[in-house]
Amino acid sequence: MEHSPEEGASPEPSGQPPATDSTRDGGSGVPPAGPGAASEALAVLTSFGRRLLVLVPVYLAGAAGLSVGFVLFGLALYLGWRRVRDGKERSLRAARQLLDDEERITAETLYMSHRELPAWVSFPDVEKAEWLNKIVAQVWPFLGQYMEKLLAETVAPAVRGANPHLQTFTFTRVELGEKPLRIIGVKVHPSQRKDQILLDLNVSYVGDVQIDVEVKKYFCKAGVKGMQLHGVLRVILEPLTGDLPIVGAVSMFFIKRPTLDINWTGMTNLLDIPGLSSLSDTMIMDSIAAFLVLPNRLLVPLVPDLQDVAQLRSPLPRGIIRIHLLAARGLSSKDKYVKGLIEGKSDPYALVRVGTQTFCSRVIDEELNPHWGETYEVIVHEVPGQEIEVEVFDKDPDKDDFLGRMKLDVGKVLQAGVLDNWYPLQGGQGQVHLRLEWLSLLPDAEKLDQVLQWNRGITSRPEPPSAAILVVYLDRAQDLPLKKGNKEPNPMVQLSVQDVTRESKATYSTNSPVWEEAFRFFLQDPRSQELDVQVKDDSRALTLGALTLPLARLLTASELTLDQWFQLSSSGPNSRLYMKLVMRILYLDYSEIRFPTVPGAQDWDRESLETGSSVDAPPRPYHTTPNSHFGTENVLRIHVLEAQDLIAKDRFLGGLVKGKSDPYVKLKVAGKSFRTHVVREDLNPRWNEVFEVIVTSIPGQELEIEVFDKDLDKDDFLGRYKVSLTTVLNSGFLDEWLTLEDVPSGRLHLRLERLTPRPTAAELEEVLQVNSLIQTQKSSELAAALLSVFLERAEDLPLRKGTKPPSPYATITVGETSHKTKTVSQSSAPVWEESASFLIRKPHAESLELQVRGEGTGTLGSVSLPLSELLQEDQLCLDHWFALSGQGQVLMRAQLGILVSQHSGVEAHSHSYSHSHSSSSLNDEPEALGGPTHPASPVLEVRHRLTHGDSPSEAPVGPLGQVKLTVWYHSDEQKLISIIHSCRALRQNGRDLPDPYVSVLLLPDKNRSTKRKTPQKKRTLNPEFNERFEWDLPLDGTLRRKLDVSVKSNSSFMSRERELLGKVQLDLAEIDLSQGAAQWYDLMDDRDKGGS
């Protein structure tokens, strides 16, 4: 404890006169100013100087003309810093007092507020280890001497060499203090292995450490004065051998992130500002976690030539837990309205944590009984020790409200195999429903087919279920190529499986690096996936070698393991990489758990499955039984092109002056209505709009067409026409000028086309490309597929209040289109037998969402089916039971059909589909419906625009990459059209990937009227744009121009400068604008801008 000078002064010896009496000035009678008076005056001046210094910012703000807001902001910043600082000092003092005298402090603070005690204070059921603390206390001063040498002789030179601005960096003070690290208790776990000892050490460090640094060149001082660190450190002694020192190695790591609190000094005092304080502590903890928190660990070998060091440093996981976050119920309401007078609900979401693995669910708005239906897979490294933690929050604009948490030791999941329970939330109210499955790691591929078949029936969100795990032990490389100028590279490795990429650390100035790192990947289907390895310089611009390894190769290897050298391609002749690849199949052992009767239905607990069962109940069907009309729908594509000789309805000056009309078209077909835009003052309008509608082959249907003149009061009638759908569906195509009825004059140009869905995905990419070509600006995006859904029934739906069956109905939604089924009264096994069809524009990106709800009871369960899964199935169809989130299953059939137009070019290049699948041929000439057949317009000439030269492997890519363009001239609309499809193999300058976009100019004009630009794509060398641009130009004017296409990237976040990645310039006079074929063009630099 520090003392004032008065408290520490020694008393005067008795018998001596006071010093003040012998030093008085006899002439004046006033005592001279002694040391005490001088120090008191200095203290007064110091206090006055501090107050004056506080007023300096206020004066400067006023002199600069700044508002009082800046002064208030600075004051708030200071008060926040002071509050954080005082809190840290108070916590440090309380912790030190507790360590100094545990019994007395515990008794005195029995009723102390929890805010006054450190968060780590607890009394774990572990053994005391005071003897160990005495050893640490004895060693502590010598450890301080070692740290001082380490920082001064190793760390300081490294810092000075890292940056020229830190040439004067030095440690001015290094003291670990007098408070050593304490071990509160030790717990020894029984290990399943005989050659291993597991220890858990509850460590607590409340130290008076002081480390000061200085950069003399900039008069900058900073440091640390006091620190707290508390956590559970696991120590593993393995392998135990029969030779001294008995223990082969010691592994140490924190099972969970320890708590950290640092008291800063000097310039680092700024880190105590609110916001910066949490950010700095988080960054420091991230650094600690990078090498000392699971799955990372510190390995200290105790014997030379220890075998399987990589396996000890990064052992295989104990298992995988598949966490199904299903639902919650009875949550507390946190949203209040009208200043708390009206109680609302909550917008709950959940955070799931296992060690450093964290997952966040989606937010369910306005719901106290949310259903998430999400699945996560976590790696379990240590049992016992790791915990599953679920925290539920209410999403708010400012700060999210805490609704409760639950914790569960992963050892209980290991023992049970499967746990499906409602768990109460601590610190709040309500329960959360979790289904936890322990997946064992099998060292052979015998059960892989069974696992894959099971996973196909699991509806998992947000990621599909995994069938295997791959662990890559990256050891070292040899004889990598040198950089330019024979400089040693700084190699690092990028490992990728599908869309997941991991990066190793960089090793500097060597062409034979040693990494000794481990990486883990989840695999959905190891038979078809690959491991892509890229060895690069740390700038990421220079590739030192590459390797692509099909993972199917491991399936035939012994114990699914490859431990060998791999030769690198695109590298030196002797360049190679040493790795150990270990694959394990994820298997859920159902030997004691009942299988679901149909793949796709999750296994619910036996009691709930047997409730209400009957011996005489009929067997549950495996597949749906739709009626004969299901899946026979077609799509009618309606092109409303133009009209001629419409009658004039507008009159001016009381009818004396004859004007024109403002025409638009209304369409009615199959219960749907459509309307074109209005063309102002034109008797020969051009609309060029496309509409699509799902139609059936029921006879007697008609397409009703009416033309009106738009007016302020009542729209005037300009004519009508009716087309029989039977005729269009039989012929497949109609392109006619239709004479309008009930009016003196006028005719309408209409093009109708029947699109029959095809159950093959081979033509999907071509369909998407053709749709982008014939797309018009005033029409919505064209459909590429038709989705047909048949919902037959549901089973095992949850009961209301635990006893009463619900009255369920289902809602099927795709995009913005929904279909609601009938409501079945009071049944937990409803039968709907309803179908619905949806137009699909982007099959790769859209999904089918099904919700089962009860009248007055809310959501009973839901299913999300990405349509990309249908594209991978035979006949593009799934027909089985789907598990609902929460409880229950539905029997549903979902089938996709690709909409191939024979009159837009796909058919000319399609060889993978037999015409026998179509109900009728579309190759016949269309029959006239009221007039001679009109010649096909240039829109139909798209049929020969798709070429097979589109393949990326057709020609080598240039050094700057390529851009894929379609350029053609629409003679009907007199427009130049360009589609920017994508880029590939763009160059990378610097460490970060570019953020590319494409800028298009129509030279010689460089103004804004001809400039077009795509959206920016983030961090990619192979961006996909699919953007369409148009210019209104006559054909002769188009042929005199050049199309300048530039691929650019933002240079930095703060800069407006744009980096040119490459460009190409196309002379439109030299291009066949009637073909419009998509083509790859090599990008050039600014000096050479020619086309490919």
From Swiss-Prot:
The modification N-acetylmethionine is found at residue 1. One of its GO terms (cellular component) is endoplasmic reticulum membrane. Residues 1-36, 604-628, 909-937 are annotated as: Disordered. It holds the Pfam family C2. Residues 50-52 are lumenal. It is a multi-pass membrane protein; Peripheral membrane protein. Residues 911-921 have a biased composition (Low complexity). The chain crosses the membrane at residues 29-49, 53-73. Keywords: Acetylation, Calcium, Cell membrane, Endoplasmic reticulum, Lipid transport, Lipid-binding, Membrane, Metal-binding, Phosphoprotein, Repeat, Transmembrane, Transmembrane helix, Transport. Residues 302-423, 444-570, 616-738, 769-886, 959-1081 form the C2 domain. Interacts with ESYT2 and ESYT3. Interacts with ADGRD1; inhibiting the G-protein-coupled receptor activity of ADGRD1. Interaction with ADGRD1 is abolished when cytosolic calcium increases, relieving ADGRD1 G-protein-coupled receptor activity. Interacts (phosphorylated form) with SLC2A4. Binds calcium (via the C2 domains) and translocates to sites of contact between the endoplasmic reticulum and the cell membrane in response to increased cytosolic calcium levels. Helps tether the endoplasmic reticulum to the cell membrane and promotes the formation of appositions between the endoplasmic reticulum and the cell membrane. Acts as an inhibitor of ADGRD1 G-protein-coupled receptor activity in absence of cytosolic calcium. Binds glycerophospholipids in a barrel-like domain and may play a role in cellular lipid transport. This is Extended synaptotagmin-1.
